[in-house]
A protein has these predicted regions:
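Alpha-helical solenoid cores of large eukaryotic proteins
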Residues: 1-108, 115-153, 157-360, 367-383, ...
Length: 449
C-alpha cells in the first residue's frame, strides 16, 4: 500500500512516532513519498497526500521547513571530497520536497519561513557541489518570486536578503557547471564529469541541458520580478553569453541554424533590461548574414522578438541598416547577381526590422527612410529591387500611422500606375523578374484598397 492508504490507517501511530523521534519519522515520510512518486502512480495525488500528512503531523510550516533544512544541512559537504551519503534521501530529494511544499504555500506563509530559507541559502553558497547549489537556486527562485506578493518584500532589508541569496546562487551555479553548459554538442556527456569527484548517483546528477532550461524558464525571468540591480543582471548575462552563447554560435557551422535551446537562452536574455551589450553581437552577426532570409518561416518568426529587442534598446542602429541600402552597384569585384541580391537583402532587412517593431517606433528615422526609398525609385532599379520596395511599403502601412506616410505616395503611386500600364501593353513572361514586380505592385494596391 502506498501513501494514501498508509495515512488513513496509521495517523495515530505516526503521531506517536513523530513525538518520539521527529527526524526519523520525517525521513520515513519523505522516503515513502519519493518511492511512490517514482512509480507509475498519480503523481499529483501522492504529492497532495504527502503534504496533507506533513501538515497533520506538524503545527506550522516553519516546523516542516526547519526539519527538512536541518536534514539538508547535515548531508551537504563543504567541498567535493565530502562523504557520500548512501541514503535514498539525498539532497535533491529533500530539495524537491521543499520546492513542492513552497509551491503550495501562499505569500504570507512564505514570508514566515523565509528566514529559515535564508539561512539555508547562505549555507548552500559555501558548498562546491553543483547539483546542491542548483536545487538551492530553484527553491530560492520559487520562494523569492512568491515573496514579492507579500508586504515583507517591501522592506529593504528583506528584499536585499532575497536578492543577494538569489544572485549568489545563480552565479555559483553558472560557475560550478562552467563549460559543461555548452549545449552546442547536443549531448550531456559533461554531466557525469561535473559530479565525478563525489561519485553521485544518476538521480543526483543534473544534466547541463536541464540546468540551462531552468535558467531560461525560471531563473532569468525572476531577475525582473525580484528587482535585481542592473549591474548584477549584466554580470550574469555576460557569464551566460560566455559559457552558452559563444560556443553555441561557433558550433553552428554545419546547419548554420542555432539549436532550439540556444534560441531559448538568447530570447530569455533579450528580455532582461540593459543587457544588450552581452548578446547583440550574436544577433547582429546572424541578421546581417547573407543566409538570414534563406531560413524557414518558423526560424524567421523565432528571430523576430530578438531583433525587436535589439532595435528597441538601440534605436540608432536602424541608421546602419538604412545606410547599407545602396541605390547602385559600387563594387567592381562582385557579380551582377551578387550585387542584386545584396541590395534586395538590404531592403528586406529594413522591412524586417520595422515589421518586428511596435507601431510608430521609428518615426524619428522615417524621413531618412523616405529619402532612401525615393533615391532607389529614381535610380531605375532592377525589377527585383523595385519589387522589394513595394513589399517594404506594405510593411510601413502595418507599422506607421497613415498620416506619417503621405510623403511617400506621390512617387509610389506614379510608379505603380506606370508599371501596371506597361504590363497591360506588354504582359511579362512567366517566372520573369518583371512578373514578380507586377505581382508586388498588385499586392500593394490590394493592401491599399
Amino acid at each position: 500500500a502506498c501513501l494514501p492508504q498508509s495515512m488513513t490507517g496509521s495517523a495515530a501511530v505516526l503521531e506517536r512516532f513523530w513525538a518520539m523521534d521527529t527526524s526519523m519519522t520525517l525521513d520515513a515520510v519523505i522516503e515513502h513519498w519519493w518511492r511512490c512518486s517514482t512509480r507509475d502512480m498519480h503523481r499529483s495525488y501522492v504529492d497532495d497526500a504527502t503534504l496533507a500528512l506533513l501538515e497533520h503531523l506538524t503545527s506550522s510550516a516553519q516546523l516542516v521547513f526547519t526539519s527538512v533544512c536541518d536534514a539538508i544541512s547535515s548531508k551537504v559537504p563543504k567541498n567535493r571530497s565530502g562523504r557520500v551519503s548512501t541514503s535514498i534521501l539525498s539532497e535533491p530529494v529533500l530539495f524537491r520536497l521543499l520546492e513542492l511544499y513552497a509551491t503550495k504555500l501562499d505569500a504570507g506563509s512564505i514570508a514566515q519561513v523565509w528566514p529559515i530559507m535564508s539561512l539555508l541559502a547562505r549555507t548552500m553558497a559555501q558548498t562546491t557541489s553543483p547539483y546542491v547549489v542548483y536545487h538551492a537556486l530553484r527553491l530560492t527562485t520559487v520562494m523569492g518570486t512568491k515573496l514579492t506578493d507579500s508586504n515583507l518584500f517591501n522592506e529593504q532589508r528583506t528584499r536585499r536578503d532575497v536578492q543577494d541569496a538569489f544572485v549568489r546562487l545563480c552565479e555559483l551555479t553558472i560557475s560550478l557547471y562552467g563549460r559543461s553548459l555548452d549545449i552546442s554538442s547536443g549531448r550531456d556527456s559533461d554531466a557525469p564529469s561535473v559530479a565525478s569527484d563525489r561519485g553521485e548517483t544518476p538521480s543526483d546528477v543534473v544534466s547541463p541541458t536541464s540546468v540551462v532550461q531552468t535558467l531560461c524558464s525560471m531563473v532569468l525571468p525572476a531577475f525582473t520580478t525580484l528587482r535585481v540591480d542592473q549591474d548584477k543582471i549584466q554580470s550574469v548575462s555576460a557569464s551566460l553569453a560566455y559559457y552558452i552563447l559563444a560556443p553555441g554560435f561557433r558550433a553552428r557551422q554545419g546547419s548554420w541554424e542555432p539549436e532550439p535551446l540556444l534560441f531559448e537562452v538568447l530570447e530569455s536574455l533579450t528580455q532582461l533590461p540593459a543587457t544588450s551589450k552581452t548578446w547583440r553581437s550574436y544577433v547582429l552577426d546572424t541578421f546581417f548574414d547573407v543566409r538570414f532570409f534563406a531560413q524557414s518561416l518558423d526560424m524567421g518568426k523565432q528571430w523576430a522578438p530578438m531583433i525587436a529587442a535589439l532595435f528597441r534598446s538601440e534605436r540608432d542602429r536602424l541608421s546602419d541598416v538604412i545606410g547599407r541600402i545602396s541605390t547602385a552597384s559600387s563594387n567592381l569585384f562582385t557579380s551582377r547577381d551578387s550585387d542584386l541580391f545584396a541590395r534586395v537583402g538590404a531592403i528586406r532587412r529594413l522591412s524586417y526590422v520595422v515589421y518586428t517593431s511596435e507601431t510608430n517606433a521609428f518615426l524619428a528615422q522615417l524621413p531618412l527612410i523616405q529619402e532612401k526609398v525615393v533615391d532607389i525609385l529614381r535610380s531605375s532599379p532592377a525589377d527585383l529591387v523595385h519589387a522589394e520596395v513595394y513589399l517594404c511599403m506594405r510593411v510601413f502601412l502595418c507599422r506607421f500611422a497613415s498620416q506619417h506616410l503621405t510623403g511617400f505616395w506621390p512617387i509610389i503611386l506614379t510608379e505603380m500606375v506606370r508599371i501596371l500600364a506597361q504590363a497591360k501593353v506588354d504582359l511579362p513572361a512567366d517566372k520573369s523578374d518583371r512578373l514578380q514586380l507586377v505581382f508586388s505592385v498588385v499586392k500593394l494596391a490590394d493592401f491599399l484598397i
